[in-house]
């Protein structure tokens, strides 16, 4: 029952979160900082009340270690959201971030000197090729759509290229953070709720560096058309409503993944999260009518095939089906 509940939270929370994020960035592409700040503040407040008992509970992992992790987490979160201001379409944003498993594996080989099976190396190639196809096709669209004059087209392309560089850096930084987190958990034990709180609480002063951008977007949000909130009946600017729903659904998504990790094997968690990403991509393409060519579909399919190959989901399906048939015969 808990597993079904967690899967529901993941699909409903994470998919709707992407919808509200896209509603925000379509009108204000540079609103990534205020979105990140709102998400961090909400999760930090919830953790302060329920995890640290209003600051009375001491951390199990030394704060000095959290400072290193938080610096990486803050950088990744800000860059990922800020990249949307560089002509990066939401579908490409999602596909690019699907390479996180592979980035983790590459850094694992370089830093931890890990060795993997041939199927894992094949998955690296597949995901890399898939992301490359989608990126090249998106580059062509940037040239076509933004190129009013040759100079405008070059500027738009360079702007987009900077966004791609930001996503690549964030992907590798996120993988490095994952390795660092793994070493901390081995040394001090798993304290995911605690890590979630400190990862969102400690970076809050860092948003002072982005305060001007956050304030400007808060003003713009307040000037958006009013709407009546369903059920409650209160009226509020539509962009503030989208931001509120984005924050709430982000929390539901995170909680769903957390429950899932305590109830299921890591393979199941990865499969659920991968399927969720694919569904989010479909929603983004169909509902928001984002440009998506046949080559984009090919690239997406290759990315997800590589991800499933990496997690050994494909090879485990026949074994699971065989076990199911044996159980049926025993009955």
From Swiss-Prot:
It comes from the Eukaryota. It is a multi-pass membrane protein. The keyword Transport applies. Keywords: Golgi apparatus, Membrane, Sugar transport, Transmembrane, Transmembrane helix, Transport. GO terms for biological process: UDP-N-acetylglucosamine transmembrane transport. One of its GO terms (molecular function) is UDP-xylose transmembrane transporter activity. One of its GO terms (cellular component) is Golgi membrane. Pfam families: UAA (PF08449). The keyword Glycoprotein does not apply. The chain crosses the membrane at residues 5-25, 30-50, 59-79, 92-112, 122-142, 153-173, 201-221, 238-260, 267-289, 301-321. It is found in: Golgi apparatus membrane. Sugar transporter that specifically mediates the transport of UDP-xylose (UDP-Xyl) and UDP-N-acetylglucosamine (UDP-GlcNAc) from cytosol into Golgi. Belongs to the nucleotide-sugar transporter family. SLC35B subfamily. PANTHER family: NUCLEOTIDE SUGAR TRANSPORTER SLC35B4, SOLUTE CARRIER FAMILY 35 MEMBER B. This is UDP-xylose and UDP-N-acetylglucosamine transporter. It comes from Danio rerio.
């Amino acid at each position: 029952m808990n597993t079904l509940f967690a899967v529901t939270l993941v699909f409903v929370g994470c998919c709707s979160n992407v919808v509200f994020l896209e509603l925000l960035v379509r009108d204000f592409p540079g609103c990534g900082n205020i979105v990140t700040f709102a998400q961090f503040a909400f999760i930090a407040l919830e953790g302060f009340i329920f995890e640290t008992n209003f600051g009375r509970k001491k951390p199990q992992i030394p704060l000095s270690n959290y400072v290193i992790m938080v610096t990486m987490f803050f950088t990744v979160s800000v860059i990922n959201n800020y990249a949307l201001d560089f002509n990066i379409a939401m579908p490409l944003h999602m596909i690019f971030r699907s390479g996180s498993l592979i980035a983790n594996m590459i850094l694992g080989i370089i830093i931890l000197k890990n060795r993997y099976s041939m199927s894992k190396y094949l998955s690296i190639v597949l995901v890399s090729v898939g992301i490359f196809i989608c990126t090249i096709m998106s580059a062509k669209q940037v040239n076509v759509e933004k190129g009013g004059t040759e100079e405008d087209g070059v500027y738009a392309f360079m702007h987009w290229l900077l966004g791609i560089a930001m996503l690549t850096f964030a992907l590798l930084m996120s993988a490095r953070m994952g390795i660092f987190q793994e070493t901390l958990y081995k040394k001090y034990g798993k304290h995911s709720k605690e890590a979630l709180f400190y990862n969102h609480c400690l970076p809050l002063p860092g948003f002072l560096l982005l305060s001007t951008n956050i304030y400007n977007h808060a003003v713009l949000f307040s000037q958006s058309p009013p709407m009546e909130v369903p059920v409650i009946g209160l009226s509020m600017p539509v962009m503030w409503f989208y931001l509120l729903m984005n924050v709430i659904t982000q929390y539901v998504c995170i909680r769903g993944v957390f429950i899932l990790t305590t109830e299921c094997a890591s393979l199941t968690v990865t499969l659920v999260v991968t399927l969720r990403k694919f569904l989010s991509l479909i929603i983004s393409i169909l509902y928001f009518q984002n440009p998506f060519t046949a080559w984009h579909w090919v690239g997406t399919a290759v990315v997800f095939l590589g991800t499933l190959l990496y997690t050994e989901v494909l090879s485990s399906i026949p074994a699971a089906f065989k076990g199911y048939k044996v159980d049926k015969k025993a009955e």
